[in-house]
Amino acid sequence: MEKREELYRGKAKSVYKTDDADRLILLFRNDTSAFDGKRIEQLDRKGMVNNKFNAFIMQKLEEAGVPTQFDKLLGDNECLVKKLDMIPVECVVRNYAAGSLVKRLGVEEGIKLEPSTFELFLKNDEKGDPFINESHVVAFGWGTAEQLAEMKKLSLKVNEVLNKLFDDAGLLLVDFKLEFGVFHGQIVLGDEFSPDGCRLWDKETRKKMDKDRFRQGLGDVIEAYEEVAKRLGVPL
């Protein structure tokens, strides 16, 4: 597989074309950002950890019947993925109250949500990824009602699979965001799943083991990511 020119540079990943029109290469960088890219720092080993963490999770999801863009690891910081036509919407599943939900509703952090909640946000850094609903997605042409239904179904399936995986590792899956795209007419899970895009707390101590350590200045960010990977059995 030949790596060609950079197609897109995000806050923490770069996307490259290949000699296959249906495949891309994702490069996981050490860049770590918060507050919609207003704060960016370099954290050693982060690209490697997130690349291998993502590969592990995507393979677990594929085994459970969730279609993903992931094909294979290419190295410590790179993987080969399917080229998706991305839907510009973030799907957020919450099992415990945290983050923007706490700020928006004024509820206490850590409350268990039963049932888990499903939310939609428009991917738009300039607007701060605004909270939207299903009617907005269809009315503005960001996706169809059928695509939304499949995205919700797959998001809840991911939650079911990963809740057990993390629980067995002594971790609470507090919340997470997913992005989806279309590949040959099928809705497929895209982007990545890593501690950058989810909240994970130690089940006993409620210690934060995710990017909130960076956002809140708690320190030991990569050490926490590596601890989560170790508990799951991710080969680093």
Swiss-Prot record:
Q: What is the E.C. number?
A: 6.3.2.6
Q: Read off the PROSITE patterns from this record.
A: SAICAR_SYNTHETASE_1, SAICAR_SYNTHETASE_2
| GO annotation terms (biological process) | 'de novo' IMP biosynthetic process; cobalamin biosynthetic process
Pfam families from the UniProt entry = SAICAR_synt
Q: Which keywords fit this entry according to its UniProt record?
A: ATP-binding, Ligase, Nucleotide-binding, Purine biosynthesis
| Species | Pseudomonas putida (strain W619)
Which catalysed reactions does the entry list for this protein? 5-amino-1-(5-phospho-D-ribosyl)imidazole-4-carboxylate + L-aspartate + ATP = (2S)-2-[5-amino-1-(5-phospho-beta-D-ribosyl)imidazole-4-carboxamido]succinate + ADP + phosphate + 2 H(+)
Q: What is the lineage of its organism?
A: Bacteria, Pseudomonadati, Pseudomonadota, Gammaproteobacteria, Pseudomonadales
Q: Which residues form a coiled coil?
A: none
What's the protein name? Answer: Phosphoribosylaminoimidazole-succinocarboxamide synthase
